[in-house]
């Protein structure tokens, strides 16, 4: 038999050095073949004095090859019991019934391998470790099964309240009902009214971009008439009218696609287990990918032909935890599976049916069932007690819900300005020259990119987030809801700054419609962040600063470095160009530079994480750490004193 060390049968016997041993012989007894007390003790239980590189004990094969026997015999034919009393240190390995059984049945133990780290590797930091000076918590391993219990990225729970039914009215229109949001029909007509007007166009011309989705009579446009249905949101009494038409181009707003995903997320996150047999689930019936962000952010919504005819819903699973059902709630379903609301929606939207009347029936059933659980308090009780305010929702699922809600607002108040979000002559001359060589003068960081930043920088409800060059406010609003942070943005161009102000108002209305808890301390400012009066105060408070400086000239990056000197210890700077030169080493000539107080790491972003290109790239996270410079100054002072 070959082992790791070669032919096991030809291994020489290891030398056992024993300082003193006492052997007591007892009366001969018939050796038992099994049992915890049968057979003599193993010689390997004696702890020998040997070097660390040798094997412990004597291999069984070596004793059977004619090795001179000393002390008690290990042969299975031995007729005497031997008891060894060791005067040296006791064995560190406790004896178990298996270790005291017959030596003939013992298998050779595999020696333990000890991993020795080099001095250089023990003090090194990975790119993620460099963001936090505190050591990472070690992985927890279940001893019984050896299963690694560290959750996968996105599978951790949020751990804070994200649903706030009790604060919906406080963030509404102060008793005026739900008349403050921009409706789906206004976007389709291209004529946004009210407080958000000015971003639309000719309604009749815009309607020519849409066509009927359902082939039945009455589901096509007739003059100003648009086929539509009203859908009830989780907030009590909040309804929105969705137009039942689809765009001719993938680049246009898709009301059917948005309605479908609205229903999917409501059925997935808001329905109590006691009523899932009525509503069903649409998650498994839609062709939606499952990354950190499961919905496209600020991009075209999938066309209805992406739907497939799915199998029926499986029976609703039992809830993971108990939820008390009120006396007025719907009784439990019978053993025979009933057709759910999700079943009707799935059938009506299937490409081989496209049944408009059936879809209207399904929406009517949904509205009636949703209104019932709103009025009897079941929905509020589920969100507050059963869901514990959403503390147990997974990070990945929460990010997808945030993305969709913000995408609704973006489509309504920013989409109409897409033709104006271009390079503007108000840029400073040096910035204009740098941007003129780019294919796209205006760019946005997409939802997946910002989700990674939130995870990587550990943004939370106690954090302050500042975005220098915030555009239309996407990242500012995402940090305020997804992380619950206080968020502030500063944008130079007037059109993106105007869109940001519109989007803040629309997004906060959407939070209320979905009963979501976001941080209302959100501000977006228009002006040059180098001279704006609010920038200095917000930077001194900031925990995370984001700056998209990919097209900034070197002079502007130098101005930013001077501004960042006021950042507090431990603050993080996320940028697309580094503030620490490659190969930077602190010395007497550069110890006063901004790079001397930074710990910088490079990371990759992936395709479609930015709007201006479909390729991957690099971004950088720098942490303010003045201790490195202090240590360098102390070492320089020590050298100077020794020279004297």
From Swiss-Prot:
One of its GO terms (biological process) is DNA damage checkpoint signaling. Its EC number is 2.1.1.360. CDD domains: AdoMet_MTases. It is found in: Nucleus. GO terms for cellular component: chromosome, telomeric region; nucleosome; nucleus. S-adenosyl-L-methionine binds at residues 442-445, 465-474, 491, 528-529. Residues 21-152 are annotated as: Disordered. It catalyses: L-lysyl(79)-[histone H3] + 3 S-adenosyl-L-methionine = N(6),N(6),N(6)-trimethyl-L-lysyl(79)-[histone H3] + 3 S-adenosyl-L-homocysteine + 3 H(+). It holds the Pfam family DOT1. GO terms for molecular function: histone binding; histone H3K79 trimethyltransferase activity. Residues 68-81 have a biased composition (Low complexity). Ubiquitination of histone H2B to form H2BK123ub1 is required for efficient DOT1 methyltransferase activity on histone H3. InterPro entries: Dot1 (IPR021162), DOT1_dom (IPR025789), H3-K79_meTrfase (IPR030445), SAM-dependent_MTases_sf (IPR029063). Residues 131-146 have a biased composition (Basic and acidic residues). PROSITE patterns: DOT1. Residues 297-637 form the DOT1 domain. Residues 93-103 have a biased composition (Polar residues). Its main location: nucleus. Histone methyltransferase that specifically trimethylates histone H3 to form H3K79me3. This methylation is required for telomere silencing and for the pachytene checkpoint during the meiotic cell cycle by allowing the recruitment of RAD9 to double strand breaks. Nucleosomes are preferred as substrate compared to free histone. Belongs to the class I-like SAM-binding methyltransferase superfamily. DOT1 family. In contrast to other lysine histone methyltransferases, it does not contain a SET domain, suggesting the existence of another mechanism for methylation of lysine residues of histones. This is Histone-lysine N-methyltransferase, H3 lysine-79 specific. It comes from Cryptococcus neoformans var. neoformans serotype D (strain B-3501A). The gene is DOT1.
